[in-house]
A protein has these predicted regions:
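Expand to "…catalyze enediolate/carbanion chemistry for C-C bond making/breaking, isomerization
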Residues: 1-167
Length: 167
């Protein structure tokens, strides 16, 4: 989470030197009351990376809560200090909005975690759109817990998402 007390040490590979990439989360790992603090921390982190570049540091992917937050982050004009963004609750319907705000130089990781993912027609259209419009898509992420929720199911406490029907 962007509220982590050792955010700099983690994202620079000091705390975990074998990391190749890391997600800085502003979504579900951050409580609503802590969002502003998380945003301040993230901006400070990116500014510090600008001042102290480290080519050996892990690639950073930012996970905003929504499109509006992503736009706010992009507007800081620090886009060259991180590798990409994880796009939450991504669907064909919001692809255009994402395209309008995201800089061309970053990689994208759309997260499929809404009920639309159960619609084969939607998925076929999304596949085509990603091929042509989102050529910087690094990978697709699956939001397993959210997909289970769409089915009115919950992951058992003592199991991982990979031990459920989604996994």
């Amino acid at each position: 989470p962007a509220t982590h007390e050792q955010l700099w040490e983690v994202t620079e590979g000091i705390k975990f030197p074998i990391l190749k990439s890391i997600a800085v989360c502003l979504e579900d790992a951050v409580l609503e009351k802590d969002v502003q603090t998380a945003m301040v921390n993230l901006k400070h982190l990116l500014q510090k990376r600008l001042e102290q570049p480290n080519l050996k540091a892990p690639a950073i992917f930012i996970r905003p809560r929504n499109i509006e937050m992503a736009k706010h982050i992009v507007d800081w004009d620090l886009n060259h200090t991180y590798s990409g963004m994880i796009l939450p609750k991504f669907t064909l319907h919001d692809l255009k909005q994402w395209m309008d705000i995201l800089p061309l130089n970053i990689n994208l990781m759309p997260t499929l975690e809404t009920k639309e993912i159960f619609d084969m027609g939607h998925n076929m259209e999304l596949n085509q759109a990603l091929k042509y419009d989102f050529h910087k898509t690094l990978c697709l992420r699956i939001g397993g817990n959210d997909l289970l929720s769409c089915l009115h199911l919950r992951r058992p406490k003592n199991s991982t998402i990979y031990q459920t029907p989604v996994g």
